[in-house]
């Protein structure tokens, strides 16, 4: 990529398929995306954030074994119309050590 696109080697960041979108920030930080952006913008590079609370959230999300089933009755067929509801239920499940399985009811 660096040879054909005139991009510095340290600015090539691999966007991998991950099990969850919530793992993307940790993956990008591990590859140095934050440092590369600050360097390109001419900003001072300080201490790398530890992302402790974020990693704790991921650990809780990944270790949850109990499942709670929720039926969601909605007006629209397109499930994206209920994205915020799905995400908020998912977050609530994570903080209560549960995986949330949502069944859409038409």
Give the ranges of each region predicted by the language model.
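N-terminal beta1-alpha1 cap of cysteine-dependent amidohydrolase-like domains
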Residues: 1-106
């Amino acid at each position: 990529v660096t040879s054909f696109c005139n991009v510095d080697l340290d600015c090539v960041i691999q966007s991998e398929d991950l099990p969850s979108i919530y793992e993307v920030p940790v993956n990008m930080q591990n590859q140095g995306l934050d440092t590369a952006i600050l360097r390109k913008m001419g900003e001072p590079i300080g201490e790398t954030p530890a992302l402790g609370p974020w990693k704790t959230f991921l650990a809780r999300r990944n270790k949850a074994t109990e499942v709670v089933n929720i039926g969601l009755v909605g007006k629209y067929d397109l499930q994206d119309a209920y994205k915020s509801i799905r995400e908020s239920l998912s977050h609530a499940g994570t903080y209560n050590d549960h995986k949330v399985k949502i069944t859409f009811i038409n």
